[in-house]
Amino acid sequence: MYKQILSLAAASALLFAESVFAQEESPIIFSNIAQKEISLVDDQGNETTSLTDLGIVVPGDTILYTSTFTNQGNEMISDIAVDNPVPENTVYLGFSARGDNTEVSFSVDDGVNYALPAELQMIGENGEQRTALPEEYTNIRWIYSGELAPGQSGSVSFKVRIL
C-alpha cells in the first residue's frame, strides 16, 4: 500500500506549478491542468459554461484545477491522498471540490489540520468562534476510498475565483 500526496501550487500569476510526491519512485503518475471557466449566452438567453486554456486571467475569473492520478504499477494501491493548497490571490468556491470515490476535507490553517466544513472553526472579529466560510479555506484534501487497480485513473478538482 502506498500513500501518495500531491501538492498543487500556483504562483500569484496563477501559472500552474509542479507536483510534489510523497515517494520518489511511485507507481502513481499525476497530471495537472488549470482551465478558465467561461460563460456564453446564446441568442435565446440560454447560458452555457465551457473551459478554455488559462491565457490571461483577471479578477473575477473562475479557474478549475484538476489533478488526475493513474496507477502505472502492477499492484492495487490504496490510501491515496491528494492535498492542494488554494492558490494565493484566489478564494475557494464553496461546494466545488469534486472527486469520485473520495472523501473531501478542508483546512483553514495552511494544511496543518483538516476537517469537514461544519467542523472548521475560526475566531470572528468579535472574538467568538464561528464556522469558517469557504472563502477562508486554505487547503483541500481528498482521500481516495478503495483501491486503484493497475492502469486505473481517478481525478479530483476544485474551483477558485481570482481576487
Feature annotation, model-predicted:
Residues S7-F16:
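Bacterial N-terminal signal peptides
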Residues Y2-L6, V20-L163:
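Exported/extracytosolic protein signature
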